[in-house]
């Protein structure tokens, strides 16, 4: 059992690590977290190739999603695959932030095991499913299994320095769940602390306005504060809101070139405000997150990528971005 970190402990930890230069990561061969982690589609060779590109580009962290159903069907096998992944990442000087729950559901369906749907042409992230699934979030009959999932995964890697941070719940309340997700958020923090996590815990705010009560509670629960931002303006206001809690601040999702939120725009702000970060996406692949969220903007002639850093052959989308990532340091 561990307690919430004090702001002093969190800030001492943050001062002891290098500035986080991270990305949200799935291999190009995976359409979602189920395909990434299932035994039949786990792809360590592609992971090794891509994380080598990441390390060479200056990345030192990855944010990675997990899927409850994969754990439920094969807990021992999943933990072996996690260990393999962490070894590959560590070999490139990269640490992991792991996500256990997620309310994003681009696919419009609940998670499922087995072969995953192929991506829909010209559609951003068409195969993405939530974890544990939108219908399970408020179904307390499932919660004993959800608790076991958190206790097992967090407990198995609770003092593993290859895991840098636990991001317990991605965008709680998304997919029109709203405040329905808050009890599971609170439970996830309690379970992770019961599991004895030695790493800091967080969940990111993503709506970015003061009136959303659940986000205040999330910031109160977190050891380090974190947020998502995809606009070309307004990031400083969200940073200030997080800084009010006196803890380190991370931006765990950003980069939307199609509306002007670029590497060139954002990294100087993060350097000045001492914000560790994880842009969305590394290699263009089956998630198709290089495409715009707005399907009507995606045509064969589309040139500007929304997310992602590398083409599938390892060549960068923009070499100038790589230079900025490599050079990133706090002011």
Feature names for model-found ranges:
Residues 1-222, 228, 233, 245, ...:
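Active-site mouth of glycoside hydrolases
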Residues 240, 267-268:
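Amphipathic helical hotspot of TIR/SEFIR-family domains
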Residues 235-248:
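A contiguous binding-surface segment within folded domains or other stable secondary-structure elements
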Residues 291-331:
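Extended, alpha-helix-rich binding/interface surfaces that flank or overlap catalytic cores
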């Amino acid at each position: 059992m561990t307690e919430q970190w004090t702001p002093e402990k969190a800030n001492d930890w943050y001062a002891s690590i290098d500035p986080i230069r991270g990305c949200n990561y799935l291999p190009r061969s995976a359409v979602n977290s189920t395909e990434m982690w299932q035994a039949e589609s786990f792809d360590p060779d592609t992971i090794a190739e891509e994380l080598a590109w990441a390390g060479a580009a200056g990345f030192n962290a990855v944010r990675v999603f997990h899927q409850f159903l994969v754990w439920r069907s094969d807990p021992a096998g999943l933990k072996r695959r996690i260990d393999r992944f962490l070894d590959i990442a560590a070999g490139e000087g990269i640490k992991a932030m792991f996500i256990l729950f997620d309310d994003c559901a681009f696919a419009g369906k609940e998670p499922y095991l087995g072969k995953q749907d192929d991506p829909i042409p010209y559609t951003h992230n068409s195969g993405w499913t939530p974890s544990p699934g939108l219908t399970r979030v408020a179904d307390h009959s499932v919660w004993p299994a959800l608790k076991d999932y958190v206790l097992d995964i967090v407990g198995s890697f609770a003092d593993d320095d290859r895991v840098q941070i636990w991001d317990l719940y991605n965008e709680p309340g998304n997919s029109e769940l709203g405040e329905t997700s808050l009890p599971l958020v609170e439970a996830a923090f309690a379970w992770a602390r019961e599991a004895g996590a030695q790493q800091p815990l967080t969940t990111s705010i993503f709506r970015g306005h003061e009136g959303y009560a659940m986000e205040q509670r999330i910031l109160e629960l977190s050891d380090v504060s974190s947020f998502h931002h995809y606009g070309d303006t307004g990031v400083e206001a969200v940073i200030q809101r997080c800084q009010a809690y006196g803890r380190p601040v991370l931006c765990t999702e950003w980069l939307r070139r199609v509306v002007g939120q670029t590497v060139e725009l954002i990294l100087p702000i993060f350097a000045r405000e001492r914000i560790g970060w994880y842009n969305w996406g590394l290699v263009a692949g089956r998630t198709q997150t290089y495409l715009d969220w707005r399907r009507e903007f995606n045509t064969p002639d589309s040139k500007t990528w929304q997310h992602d850093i590398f083409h599938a052959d390892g060549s960068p989308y923009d070499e100038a971005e790589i230079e900025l990532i490599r050079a990133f340091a706090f002011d």
